[in-house]
Regions:
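Serine-hydrolase catalytic machinery in alpha/beta-hydrolase-like enzymes
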Residues: 51-61, 72-169
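A domain-start/cap signature at the N-terminus of enzymes
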Residues: 1-76, 148, 177-195, 270, ...
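Primarily recognizes the serine-hydrolase "nucleophile elbow" in alpha/beta-hydrolase
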Residues: 164-224
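Primary recognition of N-terminal secretory signal peptides and signal-anchoring hydrophobic helices
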Residues: 317-492
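The feature captures the conserved acid-bearing segment of alpha/beta-hydrolase catalytic domains
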Residues: 198-284, 296
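Histidine-bearing beta->alpha loop at or near hydrolase active sites
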Residues: 272-277, 287, 291-298, 310, ...
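Alpha/beta-hydrolase
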Residues: 78-80, 203, 292
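Extracellular/periplasmic catalytic domains that process cell-envelope and extracellular macromolecules
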Residues: 53-55, 69-73, 98-103, 169, ...
């Protein structure tokens, strides 16, 4: 196994083109909050042939690392570019070639045949709008109703056969990953040709509900189970002409593969840095959901590494067509310590399990109104959780008085804390400390700001989203779509 060595590039910070053509013949690199590139890999080879056999010539790019051993059956990864991109562009906007250097697998980066747009299926009600020609030349290519007549799908199938002829490919370890429109292409291939792949991964580019589900809620396509990975960017936006709530769109795409793969158990959730990962184990295949905090449309440069480490590295399709899990390069485990609540939920996430609370979590605003002639300014908004739940979670003994209007805690290490309705102050080890906001009595339960409590009395690092809190023993940042996932898990 070889080691990864990053190659320096020449930054072009003045660039504003989506895919600068000069990158192909230089060492230029670009960085944007959605696309970050590497210099053009010297071993990347371009091909231009009629490989499908229908008279049309296609471009594709093969990367065979120096670490490739022709004596060993070798995994194969297809990586599919987004709209207005190319195969070589997808190569440099990912780290697949670096991971291939270390692991020894082969990569193929095909280019869409026409206009740098794949022939993808789209929602029937959007086909006319999304296929309408416009001055910007940003519209979908027409696609045949019969997948067997889809040129781009046939290109990928033909490339698979070519790679098996030319290299020692492990037929049980063929994978596909795509970005944006490439994710849509990957998902289309998964719906029709999953039997040829062990796992499919994608970043951005989710489909609307009407493409995935029938009116009765059953999947529109009876796809063969396949390990699936979906990465979402927190700052991404819905596709043009899509009026659906974007959080719902993300959830529908997640639910599709959970149903196809038979994932009914609770996921294992792990957050680190700006990454949120949820690992679902299914009766037929597994599913991984990833959300990236503060990221725009595209794919992160380390997406390939994460997909390999937590998904592709540990799955193959057996000779009988079933999915076989062999253990991933990195463990798909829960955070060792985790406490999470979402506004409006009476249940909480604690160390990989769901716990009931005495009341639902809610948001409380800290206001400034002095000197504003009757007006007010919201200076902060905090998720409030029942003190009884927080005490139980950290192993503290609770002594309540006056109908829970005053509560004292004895912490596991012998420390003490006392809280009272309407007081922003808490008494911690016989000293006054200000919380983020005052304690609130609701339905007979005393509530305190959850993040403040876990940071100050449990020594955890708490991250807040718009209406959720996730606390653990390391630095992380809770994102919008992980919060939505938690809400879906915790709602009654």
């Amino acid at each position: 196994m070889s080691k990864i060595v990053l190659r320096p590039g020449d930054p072009n910070d003045a660039n504003r083109d989506y895919l600068p053509e000069a990158i192909k013949t230089s060492q230029m690199v670009v960085n944007e909050n959605g696309n970050n590139s590497q210099p053009m890999p010297p071993r990347l080879k371009e091909f231009h042939e009629d490989i499908v056999g229908d008279g049309l010539k296609d471009y594709w790019y093969e990367y065979v690392p120096e670490s490739y051993d022709p004596a060993k059956p070798t995994p194969l990864v297809f990586s599919i570019h987004g709209g207005l991109m190319t195969g070589w562009g997808q190569c440099i906007y990912t780290s697949w070639t670096y991971v291939a250097d270390r692991e020894g697998f082969i990569c193929v980066f095909p280019s869409a045949h026409a206009r740098r747009f794949w022939q993808i299926m789209c929602e029937p009600e959007l086909k006319e709008v999304l296929s309408a020609k416009n001055p910007e030349d940003i519209y979908l290519n027409d696609f045949p109703e019969d997948i067997r007549e889809n040129h781009d799908a046939n290109l990928i199938l033909a490339l698979l056969e070519r790679m098996k002829r030319n290299y020692n490919i492990d037929e049980g370890r063929v994978y596909m990953q795509g970005m944006s429109l490439g994710n849509a292409m990957t998902q289309m291939m998964a719906r029709f040709y999953a039997h040829k792949f062990a796992a499919m991964a994608g970043s951005a580019g989710p489909a609307r509900k009407t493409l995935l589900f029938k009116a009765d809620g059953t999947p529109e396509f009876q796809s063969l189970p396949v390990d699936a990975w979906q990465a979402r960017m927190e700052l991404d936006q819905p596709a043009p002409a899509c009026s659906d709530d974007y959080e719902d769109v993300i959830a529908y795409n997640r639910d599709y593969w959970l149903k196809i793969n038979g994932c009914t158990a609770l996921p294992r959730i792990r957050l680190f840095g700006e990454n949120g990962l949820a690992f679902f184990h299914g009766e037929k295949a597994d599913y991984v959901f990833r959300d990236v905090k503060n990221r725009d449309h595209g794919q992160t440069f380390d997406d390939a590494e994460l997909v390999w480490d937590y998904c592709f590295s540990g799955v193959r399709r057996g000779a009988d067509g079933t999915i076989v899990h062999t253990g991933t390069a990195l463990p798909t485990e829960n955070d060792t310590v985790s406490v999470a609540c979402v506004a409006g939920c009476r249940r909480a996430w604690v160390n990989g399990e769901i716990r009931s609370m005495a009341g639902e979590a809610f948001l409380w605003q800290k206001l400034k109104y002095h000197g504003l002639q009757g007006n007010q300014i919201v200076r902060g908004e905090y998720l409030m959780a029942p003190l009884s739940f927080l005490a139980e979670t950290v192993g503290a003994a609770l002594d309540a008085e006056d109908g829970n209007r005053s509560c004292a805690l004895t912490l596991p290490g012998g420390g003490t804390a006392q809280f009272a309705q309407g007081s922003i102050g808490a008494v911690v080890d016989d000293r006054i400390v200000s919380m983020d906001c005052e304690a609130v009595l609701r339905e007979g339960e005393l509530y305190v700001p959850m993040a403040w409590f876990l940071r100050n009395l449990a020594g955890l690092q708490a991250s807040c989203s718009r209406d959720g809190v996730y606390a653990t023993d390391h630095e992380t940042r809770l994102s919008t779509h992980i919060t939505r996932l938690l809400r879906d898990l915790l709602k009654d």
